[in-house]
């Protein structure tokens, strides 16, 4: 069986490390695809569990010089990886502090003491632990990379500092043996020490910054409680581990507690904060029969609920898995960075050697000395990490931000595609409207306190959606009981197919149905009711009439009302320069009314599923990137045809499976927010890539000595390493801006 799982990876230090892990896994038998998210330090693997096991995947990664965290529980694997990273971070911090103290001493000797043999020996003594202990990971990783035929950032740092240290130690030893009476040679101990210090400090800051890119995912994971209060029909309660909860268990939700699993309320009422799912801050009322979801918060009162979805089947678990997979995917814009990163280190190594040779041959008397300085600077100024982090950090932050606002992104490509949207096509029913027939108009030709219970009696046994709408209206308006507080029961009741219901209640015959039934039975409709019929029908309402044997007694108008956020959402899209179209299978009159209410000028009714897909293609033929928003099976063809497919989370599974973006709640404004988030993310990715390329394009020539003929300036390797460390930190920091801007700003 083919599985898709995400695993934490330990030991990756740069983009080349990520590429090496990908290559190792893709070469493993049974692995169809492997995608590393360097920013999140994870790998998404699609593999056949009959052809290879997770242990084989782990051994494969370990053979490449890294480690894969394997666990039966995703949360446990993440916790183990986090513990390992925390331990590694603490070790790096300790080595950085020691390196900083020793390097500062070496730098002070170099700057303030007169060059002498004792000062040179002291610098050698202080630099040795910096190189041998503080910087040991660079050399160990470099050796591993060479052994496996790869090259990464550690190889550049190890080569640069190793050359500086070994050269200085060698010439100092030669001076001790053969240089008595001669001038002390130029030494690079402070360069070797400071390079390691700055790179370690940069890694430390970068790791802390990168940890914030997955804050949203960690927040989602933390929403699930570890224990839950179980109960039984006799009211006894006991604590239960979340892993031990089974479908059908009766659970108790106390005020202020998080709900443990998805279920249905069996007793009690409350209101629940579902903002973590839908992004909507207004609490949702819950009563018997209401659905509740894992991770949401019970705000007041207590209620019991029956577990329906547990473990990885809860909505929260599915959201977490979707966010993991999306964060692990690669955006198309990342391909250029990947191609450059693949040849980056060999190219820099070659340029460093050429720099040394060019200075040695053309630089005059001290050409080789300057050449060594320039060669080391070239090695340490170059930064493939900035290129490797440019896209995944922004994608990871953006997808996490989207999830926290109730927007699920299928993959990075969807996020990139959304920014190009020029036209949005919306379905009407369930997308712009609530999808639930509701009585929105009522006019009575008699005492409604007497007629309401009659209506309730006639509709009480019907399962028709219109009957449900009428019952809900009567219940909400307290019109279900007679003045004697009794529930009326029909003496006789029969269905008239296509027209309505005929019933006798307390000896009086009643009709309930459409205008055709009234006309067929010769029921008189006085002018106020007739005018109301005409007016409401022009607004797209379905008309229901109640009559006795002679005249109409009441008229109800049933409609699918517009969602409260639909008009604002349409206005926002238009302000963003996006065309808005509406298509519906309803008649033209209903389509026109809804479009007018929503402020949509382009609409069409009587549209079949094939018509919707054809309309999307028509817009695409005009060169427009089209987003389709739908919620039902009849929208799936158009969703699949569109450049960007958006499903409303309360719709069908078919629509959500096809969609690239899913809006969990019913807030239509999330569509504009998703597009704004995409625009912000793509802009920041471009900024990151520009600065990463610009930094290397400018930094490498300057390090090689390009400015020396113009102004006599050579880039000190110490400052080159500082610039390299800052380049990665700046890329991560720029990506983290999405957390503060995201979907709220264009």
PLM regions with names:
Residues 29-51, 55, 186-189, 218-313, ...:
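Conserved cytosolic catalytic loops of P-type ATPases
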Residues 112-116, 147, 166, 401, ...:
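Membrane-embedded alpha-helical bundles of multi-pass transporters
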Residues 62-80, 120-123, 127-227, 231, ...:
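Actuator/coupling domain of P-type ATPases
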Residues 1-119, 210, 219, 236-239, ...:
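Flexible metal-binding regulatory segments at protein termini and peripheral loops
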Residues 277, 336, 373, 383-458, ...:
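Conserved catalytic phosphorylation-site environment of P-type ATPases
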Residues 2-3, 19, 505-507, 547-687:
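Conserved ATP-binding TGD loop and adjacent catalytic N/P-domain core of P-type ATPases
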Residues 97-105, 335-363, 375-383, 388-393, ...:
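Bilayer-spanning, highly hydrophobic alpha-helical transmembrane segments
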Residues 103, 466, 476-593, 608:
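Signature of the cytosolic headpiece of P-type E1-E2 ATPases
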